[in-house]
């Protein structure tokens, strides 16, 4: 009879877990709606009084808080369940557990993926699909004075650690050894390029927008300002002005293919 309160507590927490997950789903639906709206009409954020970005930020904060609450309640449930289970498995249970050890190891990654939110699962699948593709990667440390971004090739994505292993196929002359170099980076250090063969589905950056783009003739990306868009130019290239690219007292305008231009990361240091 003494376990009844524990059972009641477990049931209460499972209900709370269901509620949190339903709320997360609702918030993620709203986030996806905002993403589609901004992709379809990116110029809306330039209008005075528009609060789209502020609303999106608040939705992300709400999603983060719900996710953290889900983790907290899940941990409480684990503790409650542990207190009701026998202190150790029987001999038969132990043999079964040991026999399943390898199976558990194989299933661990898939289990971890099912614990994360739907949006994170989608993000993980998206990054896993990048193997063999070129992406933009920040290879400098978080506390570095300047951010350095290069074109690299994805060679592996670890679903468990959420790390992306990339290959710098054309390191600069000042790199030690001068050969190809690999990096293991977090997902936040990777920016996928637009699909070269599908320009119609690519977000177009409006004139005046700051972007990160591959400097012509190099594999390095730098901050630039959009002067003209591919649609306006009736081509597959942006016309850009790169920061710190001054020649004869003026910034030259350079063309860059749309599939080598990405959104400027927040807090970019150059």
UniProtKB/Swiss-Prot annotation:
Residues 85-113 are annotated as: Disordered. The record marks 215, 222 as: Histone H3K4me3 binding. The SGF29 tudor-like domain mediates binding to methylated 'Lys-4' of histone H3 (H3K4me). Pfam families: SGF29_Tudor (PF07039). Expressed in roots, rosette leaves, cauline leaves, stems and flowers. The modification N-acetylserine is found at residue 2. The gene is SGF29A. The keyword Signal does not apply. Residues 242-245 are annotated as: Histone H3K4me3 binding. This is SAGA-associated factor 29 homolog A. GO terms for cellular component: nucleus; SAGA complex. Residues 125-270 form the SGF29 C-terminal domain. Residues 168-170, 217-220 are annotated as: Histone H3K4me3 N-terminus binding. CDD domains: Tudor_SGF29_rpt1, Tudor_SGF29_rpt2. It is found in: Nucleus. Its main location: nucleus. GO terms for biological process: chromatin organization; response to salt stress. InterPro entries: SGF29, SGF29_tudor-like_dom, Tudor_SGF29_rpt1, Tudor_SGF29_rpt2. Disruption phenotype: Delayed flowering. Increased tolerance to salt stress. The keyword Membrane does not apply. Belongs to the SGF29 family. Keywords: Acetylation, Chromatin regulator, Nucleus, Stress response, Transcription, Transcription regulation. Chromatin reader component of the transcription regulatory histone acetylation (HAT) complex SAGA. Involved in salt stress tolerance. Enhances the effect of ADA2B in the positive regulation of salt-induced gene expression. Residues 95-113 have a biased composition (Basic and acidic residues). It comes from Arabidopsis thaliana.
């Amino acid at each position: 009879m003494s376990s009844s309160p524990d059972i009641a507590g477990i049931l209460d927490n499972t209900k709370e877990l269901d509620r949190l997950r339903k709320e997360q789903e609702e918030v993620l639906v709203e986030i996806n709606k905002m993403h589609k709206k901004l992709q379809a009409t990116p110029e809306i954020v330039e209008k005075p009084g528009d609060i789209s970005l502020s609303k999106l930020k608040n939705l992300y904060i709400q999603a983060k808080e719900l996710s953290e609450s889900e983790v907290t309640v899940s941990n409480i449930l684990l503790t409650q369940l542990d207190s009701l289970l026998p202190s150790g498995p029987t001999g038969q249970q132990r043999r079964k557990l040991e026999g399943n050890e390898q199976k558990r190891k194989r299933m661990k990654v898939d289990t971890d993926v099912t614990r994360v939110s739907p949006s994170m699962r989608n993000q993980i699948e998206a990054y896993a699909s990048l193997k063999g593709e070129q992406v933009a990667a920040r290879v400098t440390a978080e506390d570095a004075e300047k951010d350095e971004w290069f074109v690299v090739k994805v060679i592996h994505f670890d679903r468990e650690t959420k790390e992306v292993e990339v290959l710098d196929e054309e390191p600069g002359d000042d790199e030690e050894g001068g050969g190809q170099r690999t990096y293991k980076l977090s997902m936040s250090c990777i920016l996928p390029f637009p699909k070269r063969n599908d320009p119609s589905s690519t977000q177009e950056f409006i004139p005046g927008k700051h972007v990160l783009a591959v400097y012509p003739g190099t594999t390095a990306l730098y901050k630039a300002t959009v002067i003209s868009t591919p649609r306006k130019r009736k081509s597959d290239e942006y016309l850009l002005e790169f920061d710190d690219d001054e020649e004869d007292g003026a910034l030259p305008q350079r063309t860059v293919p749309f599939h080598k231009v990405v959104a400027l990361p927040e807090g970019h240091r150059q």
